[in-house]
């Protein structure tokens, strides 16, 4: 199930759909991407201009799991749709933590690191 939620999160970013992204990501989530830290709400505002044309998740693994939290790690390969978004393209290690709040799973932490 968390794998599907991660895919939905990436798909909403690809589609520039900040409303769908905000449904999946807690407003106060900690997002650390490309050396930049922001909240889930701040990151959702960036999604409409995210600028990736494709993504592929591989190596998905559950690192830790309880009834209330799940931490995952995977590799995502992204493609940028225009040259000015080239810094968004590449291969990244990603770790995310999801929390079950009142029966709904929401992302509360996400961090990526470019694979060199």
Residue ranges and their predicted role:
Residues 1-15, 19-23, 28-116:
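A beta-strand edge to alpha-helix "cap/lid" segment located at domain peripheries
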């Amino acid at each position: 199930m968390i794998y599907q939620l991660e895919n939905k999160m990436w798909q909403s970013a690809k589609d520039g759909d900040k409303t769908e992204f905000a449904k999946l990501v807690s407003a106060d989530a900690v997002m650390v991407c490309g050396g930049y830290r922001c909240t889930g709400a701040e990151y959702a505002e960036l999604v409409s201009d995210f600028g990736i044309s494709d993504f592929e998740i591989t190596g998905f693994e559950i690192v830790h799991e309880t009834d209330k939290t799940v931490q995952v790690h995977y590799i995502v390969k992204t493609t940028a749709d225009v040259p000015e978004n080239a810094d968004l393209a590449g291969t990244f290690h990603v770790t995310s933590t999801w929390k079950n709040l009142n029966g709904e799973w929401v992302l509360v932490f996400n961090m990526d690191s470019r694979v060199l």
